[in-house]
Swiss-Prot record:
HAMAP family: 16SrRNA_methyltr_H. It comes from Hyphomonas neptunium (strain ATCC 15444). It catalyses: cytidine(1402) in 16S rRNA + S-adenosyl-L-methionine = N(4)-methylcytidine(1402) in 16S rRNA + S-adenosyl-L-homocysteine + H(+). GO terms for molecular function: rRNA (cytosine-N4-)-methyltransferase activity. It is found in: Cytoplasm. This is Ribosomal RNA small subunit methyltransferase H. Keywords: Cytoplasm, Methyltransferase, rRNA processing, S-adenosyl-L-methionine, Transferase. NCBIfam families: 16S rRNA (cytosine(1402)-N(4))-methyltransferase RsmH (TIGR00006). It comes from the Bacteria. Belongs to the methyltransferase superfamily. RsmH family. Residues 322-342 are annotated as: Disordered. The lineage of its organism: Bacteria, Pseudomonadati, Pseudomonadota, Alphaproteobacteria, Hyphomonadales.
Length: 342
């Protein structure tokens, strides 16, 4: 499951900010600046940013528990401004807080350790709890998805977001089982998925890992939120502003990589046989590195959850922000359809 290793409080054992040194280097906070931490979590990045410079941090999270932590931290450090909401709306949230532009944005994508560790949030099959998985607590839950979505819809979600090769078989078994009794707990779902794929057979990870990941990503529209967050950052960043994104899943990294390449002026379609007729719009970003930065071997030894992390960073130019609409490219059934059926 795409675990955001962090969330991220250096003060709490087991919650380590991933690639903290690399994030600070790419973000380069300076005195007097305004930085957006779009995924506040446990405040690990925010704490380090506030220590690195006499700046203001807008700590955004859609999880109310995270905002409660942020508000407690803000009592001791008024340079932190907690903002409840989705990072896909970070430009609107920043403007509502009185900041028409900002100097830096950092996004740490995925579910947090705090969320995983709370059984009642329903994110993990390691701790039995209600089948929920909602980061923000509103909208259709994982139980709604599993109990009402069509077999084809479930198979598509599990295959595209989980990259699970047994997606059709799993979807078929889930639909057959829910006729007898609806799914209500994480342990129940995990057991049925394990049975559907034939048990563990010595596998390093639980057979339900990819299915849980897919359903969680769908429930929270994580790729759509990421696409919206990137565009919001483009709109709110000043020229010279830094965008830093840490991902833990290949789908997330692919989306960030392709979007940054396009925004940095890499227009697809040209070749030496058929040159481009137009160079496209002026680049809105300059890449800090051509390739993703990965955690050091030492960090992975200390924090194994950091193993899959990739960091991509770019600097905003003075070009106008693009006006295209955000898309995750998955073409999955919209959550709104489930909302209507509830």
């Amino acid at each position: 499951m795409s675990l955001r290793t962090t969330p991220r409080s250096p003060a709490e054992p087991g919650h380590l900010p991933v690639m903290l040194a690399e994030v600070l280097t790419a973000l380069a906070p300076a005195d007097g600046e305004v930085i957006v931490d779009g995924t506040f979590g446990g405040g690990g990045y925010t704490t380090a940013i506030l220590k690195a410079a006499n700046c203001t941090v807008l700590g955004i999270d859609r999880d109310l528990d995270a905002i409660v932590r942020a508000e407690k931290m803000a009592q001791a450090n008024p340079r932190l401004v907690p903002l409840l909401g989705c990072f896909g709306d970070l430009d609107t949230l920043a403007e509502q807080a009185g900041h028409a532009s900002v100097d830096g944005v950092v996004l740490d994508i995925g579910v947090s350790s705090f969320q995983i560790d709370q059984a009642d949030r329903g994110f993990s099959f390691m701790k039995d709890g209600p089948l929920d998985m909602r980061m923000g607590g509103s909208g259709p839950s994982a139980a709604d998805v599993v109990n009402t979505m069509s077999e084809k819809g479930l198979a598509d979600v599990i295959f595209r977001l989980g990259e699970e090769k047994n997606s059709r078989r799993i979807a078929r078994v889930l639909v057959q089982r829910r006729v007898q009794a609806p799914f209500e707990t994480t342990a129940d779902l995990a057991a049925v998925v394990e049975e559907a794929v034939g048990g563990r057979r010595g596998a390093r990870s639980h057979p339900a890992t990819l299915t849980f990941q897919a359903i969680r990503m769908y429930v929270n529209d994580e790729l759509g939120e990421l696409a919206r967050g990137l565009r919001a950052a483009e709109r709110i960043l000043k020229p010279g502003g830094r965008l830093v994104v840490v991902t833990f899943h290949s789908l997330e990294d692919r989306l960030v990589k392709q979007w940054l390449r396009e925004r940095a002026g890499a227009v697809p379609g040209g070749s030496r046989h058929m040159p481009l007729m137009s160079k496209g719009p002026a680049p809105a970003f300059e890449l800090q590195e051509n390739k993703a930065v990965q955690p050091s071997e030492k960090e992975v030894e200390t924090n194994p959850r950091a193993r899959s992390a990739k960091l991509r960073a770019a600097i905003r130019t003075n070009a106008d922000a693009a006006l295209d609409e955000a898309s995750d490219g998955m073409n999955l059934p919209p959550l709104a359809e489930l909302e209507k059926s509830r």
